[in-house]
Design a protein with these regions (language model features):
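A short, N-terminal amphipathic alpha-helix
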Residues: 75-85
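Short secondary-structure boundary motifs at beta->alpha junctions and helix caps
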Residues: 58-65, 140-182, 186
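Surface-exposed short loop/turn segments
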Residues: 24-27, 86-142, 152-163
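Bacterial N-terminal signal peptides that target proteins for export
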Residues: 1-8
């Protein structure tokens, strides 16, 4: 019985620490909308997708690397599948023009399923800021660098035992694909996902 009481005290202590600890970095995009690319993306014949990476202090942390792997799977399912379709089409330029897509997670606070089970909503909210660097392979010119923000509120994460936390990674992958599609024939940019809250 004493062991269970001790575990309960430890779990509650961890929960309160997580609940009231301040993030080292504020996780949010520069604004509510991404600017359009410097040229129409339909001007490229081929797409080369680089593996997603974590930047700065977020790299090398086990929970963040787990989130990165989940994001990569969802990115491959969405953007990767679309790129395969585009690359199967005949090229309109000779030589073919290639757009390099470099996804990265700039900032993240990811609450694992285990933390949700132990601490629930006390573990806090998950947040992620993803960026896409779109580069003309031939010239090295950066065509666009949109960013996408999503979060999973603490209570949503608790009620779903972490499903909501993982869903934010799916949404950022979907937003990445939406940007690539929306800016093919007209340069319109796209929302960042930030609602000012």
């Amino acid at each position: 019985m004493r062991m269970w009481k001790w575990l309960a005290v430890v779990a509650l202590s961890m929960a309160w620490t997580l609940a009231f600890a301040k993030d080292k970095d504020e996780i949010k995009p520069a604004g509510t909308s991404n600017p359009p690319p410097s040229e129409l993306l339909s001007g490229f014949d081929r797409y080369e997708v680089k593996p997603a990476v974590l930047t700065g202090v977020y790299a090398g942390q086990e929970i963040n690397e787990t989130a990165l792997a989940s994001f990569q799977r969802n990115f491959d399912e969405r953007v990767g599948a679309w790129v395969a379709e585009q690359n199967a089409r005949p090229a309109r330029h000779d030589p073919a023009r290639t757009l390099v897509i470099e996804p990265r997670i700039d900032k993240i606070r990811f609450i694992s399923g285990g933390a949700r089970v132990w601490a629930g909503a006390f573990a806090g909210s998950s947040r992620v800021l993803v960026a896409l660097r779109l580069v003309d392979q031939a010239t090295g010119e950066v065509i666009a660098e949109p960013e996408f923000y999503q979060h999973a509120k603490a209570m949503a994460g608790a009620w779903t035992f972490g499903v909501a936390d993982n869903n934010m990674l799916i949404r950022t992958a979907t937003m990445s694909l939406d940007y690539l599609k929306a800016n093919q024939d007209q340069a319109v940019g796209a929302p960042t996902g930030w609602e000012g809250k």
